[in-house]
A protein has these predicted regions:
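Residue-level preference for short coil/turn positions at secondary-structure junctions
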Residues: 18-20, 51, 145
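Short clusters of hydrophobic/aromatic residues that line enzyme substrate/ligand-binding pockets
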Residues: 14-15, 99, 122, 156
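A short beta-strand-turn-helix
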Residues: 5-22
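Generic structural signal for beta-strand residues in well-ordered domains
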Residues: 15-17, 25, 48, 142
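Structural alpha/beta surface segment adjacent to cysteine/selenocysteine redox centers
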Residues: 25-109, 114, 179-190
């Protein structure tokens, strides 16, 4: 089984408590139809597990197949800088068929983000390095398609239908990778 490299850190986008016993990390592509189908399942897993789950998302845009995936990831990162990563993440997946730059700017506007800042950051590629860093970490972790999930730092290769995924999460040993993790107390965690 593949291990997550690097482990979850304060640099990651996390939803749920950092001390949750289970961490589900997804390497995803905003334009991938499989990720689009996994999105509501992951949301339901979050709802059912509540504070027992920490969700982490890392970008893994498959640009050669999905021409809008990289800019969608950069838009989510731009929203993250303004404190609304998860809101943009949700908006993108909920409107997966509409991912042009104009669409992404429209989502930014609807979320109350600084629209001109997002537009400038997309045009200049300010967040491209972060997206590439996530992608490289996925390659190091053995990711070769999306979505790819890790449960408590170990690659999960089972089915990601709701029942099977919940069963795997409920049966996961506590996340040993969190012990000794350095925390940045200024980090805001979306719950």
């Amino acid at each position: 089984m593949s291990r997550l490299r690097p482990p979850v850190s304060d640099a990651d986008h996390r939803a749920g408590p950092d001390d949750a016993p289970v961490t589900l990390l997804e390497y995803g592509d905003y334009e991938c139809p499989h990720c689009g189908r996994a999105y509501p399942i992951v949301r339901e897993v979050q709802r059912r597990m509540g504070r027992r789950l920490r969700l982490v998302f890392r970008n893994f845009p498959l640009a050669e197949m999905h021409p809008h995936a990289e800019h969608a990831a950069e838009a989510a990162e731009a929203a993250g800088v303004q404190g609304k990563f998860w809101e943009m993440h949700d908006a993108i997946f909920e409107h997966q068929a509409a991912l042009t730059d104009a669409d992404l700017i429209r989502y930014a506007r609807s979320l109350g983000l600084d629209e001109s800042r997002v537009k400038d950051e997309l045009a200049t590629g300010v967040h491209a390095a972060r997206v590439r860093e996530d992608f490289r970490s996925g390659v190091r972790s053995g990711v070769n398609g999306t979505p790819t999930f890790f449960i408590n730092g170990t690659r999960y290769d089972g089915s990601w239908d709701l029942g099977t995924l919940l069963e795997a999460l409920e049966g996961a040993p506590e996340d040993a990778g969190k012990r000794g993790q350095v925390r940045n107390l200024g980090t805001v965690v979306h719950e």
